[in-house]
């Protein structure tokens, strides 16, 4: 992989998610240069100018401009957000037929520029699209990843915070598998204040007798659909997730994030992208952290892998 000054990010797709992700990157001053690409050049230009107009009030100036695929050549990260708003209560896999053509065209154009950075896939179904982008791009496995279950994990922590009244940042643990209906909460990994969550509830029955892990997991799974039904789409949560992943990679933070990455023997799976805890570094998905899951959790992970793999068949 080419060694670069970690300072340039390209976002392809300036809809709600792409534009909000750009706003997060700019407000946090994550890079020196941010380039926006869209099928509508006017839309990309408008978003870039709107973002740049607030530069006086940012902690760090980020140069924002509209561009084209040639700008990907020396980019450190390309974020792909192309797609359309899903209807309420829809399965993310239902977007596959529409999205795959868009993603294929984007990946081809990105690679034609000479790009050798990290692709961060956001487009749904994200696990399938990350696998497709990896296969189509020819990049090493570390350099293609999806947002995976990072947002779902954040939702889990938020909901546990709502149920207990405690700061969600006290919660540890992961949602794993597909970013979709077959995702699962790996309860064996969940802790609150360093104490296993099941034990925390048992030790505080007088306060949290009404807290149900089954209900928490279902709320986590359906949270996205509820937001879509209420406001027509999701953008803030996923955009914050994207900004966090971008920061972790650009700044080589070595954070462990449940992104969608290629399993090649880990958890007994091969040739499939799933949301699993992964150490993120400047080179992308540096190393998968293989957790000691329960037998039930492993079965759920394998089930999720089967579903994702089925939808990958025939795409190439």
Curated annotation (Swiss-Prot):
InterPro entries: L-lactate/malate_DH, L-lactate_DH, L-lactate_DH_AS, Lactate/malate_DH_C, Lactate/malate_DH_N, Lactate_DH/Glyco_Ohase_4_C, NAD(P)-bd_dom_sf. Gene3D superfamilies: Lactate dehydrogenase/glycoside hydrolase, family 4, C-terminal, NAD(P)-binding Rossmann-like Domain. It is an enzyme of class 1 (oxidoreductase). Substrate binds at residues 92, 124-127, 152-155, 234. One of its GO terms (molecular function) is L-lactate dehydrogenase activity. Pfam families: Ldh_1_C, Ldh_1_N. Keywords: Cytoplasm, NAD, Oxidoreductase. One of its GO terms (cellular component) is cytoplasm. The active site is at 179 (proton acceptor). Its EC number is 1.1.1.27. It catalyses: (S)-lactate + NAD(+) = pyruvate + NADH + H(+). GO terms for biological process: glycolytic process; lactate metabolic process. It comes from the Bacteria. Pathway: Fermentation; pyruvate fermentation to lactate; (S)-lactate from pyruvate: step 1/1. Catalyzes the conversion of lactate to pyruvate. Homotetramer. Belongs to the LDH/MDH superfamily. LDH family. This is L-lactate dehydrogenase 1. It comes from Bifidobacterium longum (strain NCC 2705). The lineage of its organism: Bacteria, Bacillati, Actinomycetota, Actinomycetes, Bifidobacteriales. The gene is ldh1.
